[in-house]
Structures are given as C-alpha cells and as structure tokens.
C-alpha cells in the first residue's frame, strides 16, 4: 500500500525554525515531524511513501533516503516545479500512485495525531466508495472549515467554511484514503482537494468521514506546535510511559533524550521535551517548552512556553515566556527578559524584549 505526504510548502508559519531546515524535518518531541508520520504508516503496512517535495527538496531527500533501509520501505520523491496546491501533487504523482489498484493514503505534513491508519483502511473498504477523510471534533468550529456528515454512516454531505452559526463541530483532520479512480478528477494544475475535489465527491455520494478518537493537532505554527507537544506527551504517558523521564525535579510528562544532561536543583516540566546534546545547568526551571538538539541553558534561567532552536545558548538568570521562539544558533545574554520574541537564526540578543516582536 502507498501513501503520499504533502511536504512542498515553505513552512512560513513555523519561522524562524524553518529558515534553517524544511518544516517536515523540524524536531517534534525529539523526532522529525515527517518521521512520526512515516513510522506510523510503515507500522500500518504501508510499503511505499511518496513525498511531494519542493522547498529544500535535496535536504528532505537526503534525510529520508537514510530512513529507507531502517524502516524497510520504499521512499520516492515527486518534485513540484511550481506550487500545485493540495490536489495537484496527486496528479503529478499519478504514475507512482497507480502502480497498483490499491487505495492510498494522503497526509498533510503539519498533522500530528493518534494515526488510525489500519482502522481507516477497514472503514474505506466497508463503505466501498472513492474517498475517506479523517475528521476530528474541535471546541471552536467557527475557526475552521467544518464537515457535515451522517452520524451513523459517515457519509459526507457538505463542507462549510468557518460557519458563523453551528452546523457541525467536526473538521477535516488532513488525513485521507483514496481509491485510484479519484485521480481522474484531478488535473495537473494548482488545485485544492478540500475546496474543489471533495465537495464534488460529497455531492455524488463518494466521500465518507471517519471520526478520530485520539488527539489531533495541526502543528504548523509555534503556539500549536507547543499544544501538540502537550497532547503527544499525554498520549505517550498512556501508551508508552516507560519512554518518559522520571526522577528528582521532573514534573509531569517530560521527554528527555538520553544524550541530554540536566544539572542539580532543576524543575523540568510539566510538558517539556529536551533533545540530544541539550545541557541544562543547575537551578533551571523549564515548563511547556521544547529544547532542540545541542542547545545550552545556563544556570538559574526560567523558561515557559518556548521553543529553543538547535545550538542556542541561553545565559544565566534569563526569563523567556509567551511563545518565545529562538531560531538556530541564537545567543541570549545573561539576565535578559524575552516576552513572545521570535528571533531569527544566528542572532545575539543583548537587551530585553519586553513586548512580542520579531528580532532580525
């Protein structure tokens, strides 16, 4: 079985992290976002993953080719010369997707969830129509495009973009399984599968929705990245608690790479991820943060709701909060306060940032 993952975007919403690396390779809970998806697909029996690539495609190809042998699957690249939206890449990869008559998965690269791939295959085969989409319930459906479907069968009737009155609290979760016949509906041109293809399929009774029972988050921007981390760690606590850290100074769900080092009298957690090579000196407090590979947090600093990029250096007695994001190789000098700062790579910060802003 095959899967196509849409990884061609520029990742602008997740800057400054994506100024150094394509978004699918950004570390989420100590593993590239893309690898979370590919590993889940492989575990469900997918043996061929096609990446619809554009931005930084050579970096993506090099990294994922290294994963082919480890995972025992085939990984192919489908190169977009121009942006093709969310449906055009399927037409571009038509020859690869149609090598067999089996249905195939399509994923948005921003999605992290309890991927129910095996259940989706069963659901798709049961209803026997062209397409199945994963939907998830949200508290504020007016912020999204919602899916109106039958409660018992899942048959999709229509899509409503950002409704002002309640029609449904189920939204498109960005994970699909499609029969090859769907490709006849798609031309090789910029096309939206959500706005141009799915509504027609729904009108013809060819589209069904399966509700996700576990967690879900689109982690394409920093605040949602951190929320997704919290949900992922909660799920990890339920399924694989042995992977989480415990011991003195560890509070709640904390994921620590074995190659990270934590000093004495620290308070780490809840909801923290520390990557390989991270050094946390004595007396540091970290809450609801992800600290990426080889970053160094000096003594007595206090971090909450932050993303600390690769190889950053945070000085002593620093306070950072309110979704502060440090790009790669940023230096924050001692005794500074950063409130909602977004700092581009390779900058040295010598004064406090009391109000949210971009540091270029």
UniProtKB/Swiss-Prot annotation:
Region annotated Hexapeptide repeat domain, chain positions: 245-360
Gene3D superfamilies per record: Hexapeptide repeat proteins (2.160.10.10), Spore Coat Polysaccharide Biosynthesis Protein SpsA, Chain A (3.90.550.10)
Metabolic or biological pathway: Nucleotide-sugar biosynthesis; GDP-alpha-D-mannose biosynthesis; GDP-alpha-D-mannose from alpha-D-mannose 1-phosphate (GTP route): step 1/1
UniProt-recorded name of the protein: Mannose-1-phosphate guanylyltransferase catalytic subunit beta
PROSITE patterns linked to this entry: HEXAPEP_TRANSFERASES
Keywords per UniProt: Cytoplasm, GTP-binding, Magnesium, Metal-binding, Nucleotide-binding, Nucleotidyltransferase, Transferase
Subunit note: Component of the GMPPA-GMPPB mannose-1-phosphate guanylyltransferase complex composed of 4 GMPPA subunits and 8 GMPPB subunits; the complex is organized into three layers, a central layer made up of 2 GMPPA dimers sandwiched between two layers each made up of 2 GMPPB dimers. GMPPB catalytic activity is reduced when part of the complex and binding of GDP-alpha-D-Mannose by GMPPA induces allosteric feedback inhibition of GMPPB.
Biological process according to GO: GDP-mannose biosynthetic process; protein glycosylation
A Gene Ontology cellular-component term: GDP-mannose pyrophosphorylase complex
Principal location: cytoplasm
InterPro entries assigned to the protein according to its UniProt record, in alphabetical order: GMPPB_C, GMPPB_N, Hexapep_transf_CS, Mannose-1P_guanyltransferase, NTP_transferase_dom, Nucleotide-diphossugar_trans
Comment on protein domains: The N-terminal substrate-binding domain adopts a Rossman-like fold and has a binding pocket for GTP or GDP-alpha-D-mannose. Substrate binding is coordinated by an Mg(2+) ion. The C-terminal domain consists of a series of tandem hexapeptide repeats that adopt a beta-helix conformation. The beta-helix forms several protein interaction surfaces involved in assembly of the GMPPA-GMPPB mannose-1-phosphate guanylyltransferase complex.
Catalytic reaction equation(s): alpha-D-mannose 1-phosphate + GTP + H(+) = GDP-alpha-D-mannose + diphosphate
Residues reported in the UniProt entry to bind Mg(2+): 110, 218
Cofactor names: Mg(2+)
Originating species: Bos taurus
The family this protein is said to belong to: Belongs to the transferase hexapeptide repeat family.
Superkingdom per UniProt: Eukaryota
GO MF assignments: GTP binding; mannose-1-phosphate guanylyltransferase (GTP) activity; metal ion binding
Residues of the active site: 162
NAD found in the keyword field: no
Chain's gene name: GMPPB
Subcellular location: Cytoplasm
Span list, region Substrate-binding domain: 2-222
């Amino acid at each position: 079985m095959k899967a196509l993952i849409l990884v061609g975007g520029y990742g602008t919403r997740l800057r400054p992290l994506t100024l150094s690396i394509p978004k699918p390779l950004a570390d989420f809970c100590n593993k590239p976002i893309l690898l979370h998806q590919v590993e889940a697909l492989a575990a469900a029996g997918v043996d061929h993953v096609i990446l619809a690539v554009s931005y930084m495609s050579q970096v993506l190809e090099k990294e994922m080719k290294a994963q082919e042998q480890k995972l025992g699957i085939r990984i192919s690249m489908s190169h977009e010369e121009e942006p093709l939206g969310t449906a055009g890449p399927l037409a571009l990869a038509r020859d690869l997707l149609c090598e067999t008559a089996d249905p195939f998965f399509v994923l948005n690269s921003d999605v992290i969830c309890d991927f129910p791939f095996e259940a989706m295959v069963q659901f798709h085969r049961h209803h026997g129509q062209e397409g199945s989409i994963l939907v998830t319930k949200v508290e504020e459906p007016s912020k999204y495009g919602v899916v109106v479907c039958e409660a018992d069968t899942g048959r999709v009737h229509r899509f409503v973009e950002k409704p002002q009155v309640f029609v449904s609290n189920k939204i498109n979760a960005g994970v699909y399984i499609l029969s090859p016949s769907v490709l006849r509906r798609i031309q090789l041109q910029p096309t939206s599968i959500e706005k141009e293809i799915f509504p027609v399929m729904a009108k013809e009774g060819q589209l069904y929705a399966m509700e996700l029972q576990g967690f879900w988050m689109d982690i394409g921007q920093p605040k949602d990245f951190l929320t997704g981390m919290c949900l992922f760690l909660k799920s990890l606590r339920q399924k694989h608690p042995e992977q989480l850290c415990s011991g003195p100074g560890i509070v709640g769900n904390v994921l620590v790479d074995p190659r990270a080092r934590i000093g004495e009298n620290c308070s780490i957690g809840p909801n923290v991820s520390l990557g390989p090579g991270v050094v946390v000196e004595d007396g540091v407090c970290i809450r609801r943060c992800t600290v990426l590979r080889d970053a160094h947090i000096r003594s007595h600093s206090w971090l909450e709701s932050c993303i600390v990029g690769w190889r950053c250096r945070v000085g002593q007695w620093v306070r950072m909060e309110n979704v502060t994001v440090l790009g790669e190789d940023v230096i924050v000098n001692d005794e500074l306060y950063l409130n909602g700062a977004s700092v581009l790579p390779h900058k040295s910060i010598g004064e406090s940032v009391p109000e949210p802003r971009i540091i270029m």
